[in-house]
From Swiss-Prot:
PANTHER family in the record: POLYRIBONUCLEOTIDE NUCLEOTIDYLTRANSFERASE, POLYRIBONUCLEOTIDE NUCLEOTIDYLTRANSFERASE 1, MITOCHONDRIAL
Catalytic activity: RNA(n+1) + phosphate = RNA(n) + a ribonucleoside 5'-diphosphate
Segments forming domain KH: 557-616
Subcellular location: Cytoplasm
Protein name per its UniProtKB record: Polyribonucleotide nucleotidyltransferase
Organism: Staphylococcus carnosus (strain TM300)
Family according to the record: Belongs to the polyribonucleotide nucleotidyltransferase family.
Amino acid sequence: MSQEKKVFKTEWANRPLSIETGQMAKQANGAVLVRYGDTVVLSTATASKEPRDGDFFPLMVNYEEKMYAAGKIPGGFKKREGRPADEATLTARLIDRPIRPLFPKGYRHDVQIINMVLSADPDCSPEMAAMIGSSMALSVSDIPFQGPIAGVNVGYIDGEYVINPTVEQKEVSRLDLEVAGHRDAVNMVEAGASEITEKEMLDAIFFGHEEIKRLVDFQQEIIDYLQPEKTEFIPKERNAEVEEKVTALTEEKGLKDAIQTFDKKEREENIDAIRDEVVAEFEDEENPDNDEVIAEVNSILNDLVKEEVRRQIADEKVRPDGRKPDEIRPLDSEVGLLPRAHGSGLFTRGQTQALSVLTLGAMSEYQLIDGLGTEEEKRFMHHYNFPNFSVGETGPVRAPGRREIGHGALGERALRYIIPDTKDFPYTVRIVSEVLESNGSSSQASICGSTLALMDAGVPIKAPVAGIAMGLVTRDDNYTILTDIQGMEDALGDMDFKVAGTEKGITAIQMDIKIDGLTREIIEEALEQARVGRLTILNHMLETIDQPRPELSAYAPKVETMTIKPEKIRDVIGPGGKKINEIIDETGVKLDIEQDGTIFIGAVDQDMINRAREIIEDITREAEVGQVYNAKVRRIEKYGTFVELFPGKDALLHISQIANQRINKVEDVLKLGDTIEVKVTEIDDKGRVNASHRALLNKED
C-alpha cells in the first residue's frame, strides 16, 4: 500500500465524498479514510500470513460505533464502549455479505475488516461510507479481492426514488433499501417497506445499481492510480487419482438415491453412510500423510454432493425432497397454545417450525436506542432464538449471535409496518420467536408465526404478513429459481432471497448470494415467484385465524389514554417527580406522559386505572367563572379564608364575601375543615381565583 497521503474526491447524492490513503493505519494490509459530508470512517483490511485448516473462508467484518463520533459519552458505570450494539452488528453483516463472494475460491487466510466511525453525520450514512471503505481497504491492499463493490441506500418518496435519503426524508419514505454490488450486477439487497409492489422494488434495486456503477468506477480510478501489488493466490490442486476414485465410489454406492428423500435426518444419514464407506477405502494407518488424504477425500465428497444436488435441480427439475421448483412444503398452523401468554402462534413448514410468543407492555417498557443518532424509543421488538436442539445438536447455550440478531431484525422489519400506531394501540409489543425445528427458512417461519401471535393477541394489525425464502441454482447458461428452500438448498445453492409481505405488497426483503451477482431478469422472476408463494402461505394462515381477536388476553395489561393541556404536565409530575410517584404508589399503575399532554395509564385492573384517572383529572381540573363548588376551608387569614375548590385548586373567599352582614372575624362563621358552597367570581391573569358565598345567598333571597 502506498505510504504517501493521497486524497481522491467526488460527489455522492449531492454531498462531498473523499477517500484518503497513505496516512493512517499503515501497518494494516490496506487502510482508507472515508469522508462523506461530516461523516468520517476509518476502514482497514488485514490478512493472516498463513491459511487456516478447514473448508471455510474465515472472514470477519467489524463495524465499531465510537460514541465520541456523535459527541456523546457512553452510558453505564464504565463509561466506555462495550459489546457492539445490535445496530452495529447488523451493519457488519450488511458489509460482509456483498464482499464475501468476491474472494478467490479456496482462499483460507483469515481476513479481518474493521470500520471505525470517527465522526457521524446522520444525513451522510456512516454505514454506506463503511461499505465503500471496506471495499477500498481490500482493493488497495495486497489481499486477493475481485472487487471493488459499493452500496447505497434508496428511499421512495412521492413516487420518486432517492439515493441516500436524509433523516427527515426517511421519515416519509415508503422504502428503506440497502443495495450493493459491483459494476456488472447486484449481489446484496436488504429492505424494509410499506407494502410496495414487486415492480417498485425491482426498479428501486436497479435505480440504486446505477449509482453503484458510478461509485465503482470512482474506486477503480483510485486503484488504477495506486497500482497496488496483489499477493498471488494459487489454489491447492487435488490429487487427480484420489478424485477419480472417490467419484467412482460415490456413484457406485448410490449418491443420487441417497440424496432423494423427504426427511432431512434420513438424507444426512444416507450421505454419512456413503462417506464412511468411501473414507474407509483410503484409511492407511502406516501412511504419515493419511490425515491429509482423508481431509481431501471429505472435501471431494462435499463437492460431489453439491454437484449432484445442483445437477438434479438444474437438469431434472427435482429437489432433494422430491418437490418441484415452485412447490412449498406442507404447512401447519396453530394459535392460542400458551394460556398465560398474551398471544402465541406455532407455524410449521415441512421440517421447519417456529413458536412465536407475544407480550404486551406499557408504553414505558419501550427499548431506548442510544446510538450515534438521536435517541430512539422502540415500542415494537422481535427477537429470534435458534437453540441447538432445533437441528438435533448439542452445545453451549450462549447469548444471541450475529445470525440470531440478524434474523430477529429481519422479522422486525417485515412486521413493523403492520403494527398499529400509538394512538390506536398504546402498548409496547415484544415477540420472541423460538425456532423448535430447522431445515431452512426459519427466519421466514418466525415471521409467519409472529403474525399468528399478533392476531391471537388481538393486536389490530393493518394486514397479515407471511415470509418465504427463494433459492437459485445456476448451471452453464441456465438457472432454476426455487420456492421455499430447505437447508441443503440454501447451503449448496447460489442464493438465499427472503421476501416478506402482505397480500398487497412487500414489507421486507433480504438477499444473499454466493455468485458474482444477479441480473434484473433473475431478480424479477424471483420476486414474482415469491409473490405467488407468499399468497399461498397467507391463505393457509387465514384458515387458522382470519382476523385479530376482538379482545386482548385477560392476562394482558390494560392501557388507556387521556389528554391534558401541556402546561398541566408539570402539575401531574410535581417537583422532582413527587406527585407522579404518589399517584403510582397509591394506584399501582404505570404512567407515561408525552410532551403533547397525552397520558398512557397502564394496569392489570380497571379499578386501578379509574382511580389514577380521577386523581389526574383533579390535579389538572380548572376552575370556571360562574361555577359553584362545595369548598373546604384550608387556611384562615384576617382578610378572609382560602378554600379548596377541588384537590390542587384553592380560591380566596374574602371576608366581605362570606355573609350578607358585616362580620369582624372569619372564625365567627367558619373554622378549618368546614365545607361551604362558593361561586367563582373571578380568575385573574396569574390564575388566582376569587370566590363568593355571599353571591349565592343573594341569589337565594
